[in-house]
Amino acid sequence: MVFIRKVPTGSGATAVQIAEYAAGKQRIISHVGSAHTEAELGVLLERARVLMTDPAQLVLDVEATPAPPVAGLLKPPGPQSLFDAAVDPPAVRRDGPGRVVGNDSRVLYAALTAVYADLGFDTLGDRVFRDLVLARVVEPTSLLDAGRVLTDLGRSPASYATMKRTLKRVVTGEFRDDVAKLCFEHASASGDISLVLYDVTTLYFEVEKEDKLRKVGYSKERRVDPQIVVGLLVDRAGFPLEIGCFEGNKAETSTILPIITAFQERHDVADMVVVADAGMLSATNLRELDEANLRFIVGSRMTKAPIDLASHFRWHGTWFTDGQIIDTLTPRTGRRSENNALLRAEPVWDPAAHPGSWRAVWAYSRKRAVRDNRTLNLQEERARAVVAGQKAARTPRFVTTSKGTPTLDEASIARARALVGLKGYVTNIPAAIMDPGEVIGSYHDLWHVEQSFRMSKTDLRARPMFARTKDAIEAHLTIVFAALAVSREVQARTGLAIRNVLRQLRPLRSATIAINGAEQTFPPAIPAEQQTILNAIVGDKVTH
């Protein structure tokens, strides 16, 4: 039987040893160290317990050849005398007190590693990729600085050269395909992938010259730097399913079909609904999605409202009730409507009966109307100030110029006020399959993909400022894609923003103490609030 033995030493210390009973006698297996204080004794006892529970370490300690004792050289013999000079007794060496040699956030790392494994990413078999993904979740930084973040998480980081080799592996073969497949498997097992959400964003580079990928194009931030266009497909909860990048001058509307097609081919998915915002609304886009047997829900533009709602305006004027929904038609191209405004009843869209139209759903909200009116009032005030010469500015909305004189466009203001509170949606899903309320609810799930983009551009800093080549950018986006999946899963389990989770868990520091040549790491005391977060993330999978 193996046990821990405490023995007083001649120097007044307490030796901690691991021993066993063999043939009725005690046999020392390993000498752990000598303690001079209660604190040091506690450290050595904990170290001994760890050695006893880890046979591999104990075997190494037992089989290691003990270092020979260091003996000081004696002085050469001097002349003989009748009485030898007094010789000082050898000094008793005492090890110094215990010292803290490091502290880290390994509790946080263990929690994120558990989530990474639950998503199936551990089957990729690449520990360096895993560390780069988790480092980006915790603190986005350059590849060169990732080692510092990993060290702070209690990891021994790979060398910079190894990290670069990992990035090369990521862009070769089917690495991103494997990541996307694992994301799909997780999403399909834990949620609903019959409806997916798509959106695009731009990531700019502070460089002077364009190349084949980084080009100057349309930027919502009005930047003139070379950029790339990134498309992201997520499920209705915002969990990432597909990512792709395009040339910076590529129209956003021309990115949706390649991403959707790649997703379908990879996972053999045929029947699904694609939701996108009004920026994806182009006649060609919708036609191609329909020809690919895909169902879609996209936001409509306000300029379509007078045509789509012609019947309502004829029979009811501009009067709407809060929550009112109008299910009607919208022209596929142009302004010619198949809706007969002379009929009071709105037509029910049928693809065979209305080949030149899509189904349009318009909803009125009093809350939205109040917000729209507030915006219109400000715009009208600005326009009147410009017309009155009180304010010099670029021509604002509702101001027209006639013979060099600015005038207020009263007709445009009236048309705008007639449409306050309205929001439109275009779809090719018949009412028999999806009612108007579900169409509206599905579209409003788009905030999840918008939130994912905000996470990737802020919390994960997706902008690859240190990447220069196309392969490096693609590898960077693969890491961001996996990091977004981990972050989304953490948020889903805790109900907290990933930034909040990191702010609460990263300060939980484990301390490593060295004493008598031995090192032992002690976990932090975890307050109840942080323990609740850990339990939500991994249950009892993390041992402290």
Give the ranges of each region predicted by the language model.
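Short, surface-exposed polybasic/aromatic micro-patch for ligand or macromolecular engagement
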Residues: 4-53
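Intrinsically disordered, low-complexity segments enriched in small/polar residues
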Residues: 8-10, 31, 70, 76, ...
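Extended, charge-enriched "interface" segments that sit outside catalytic cores
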Residues: 55-154
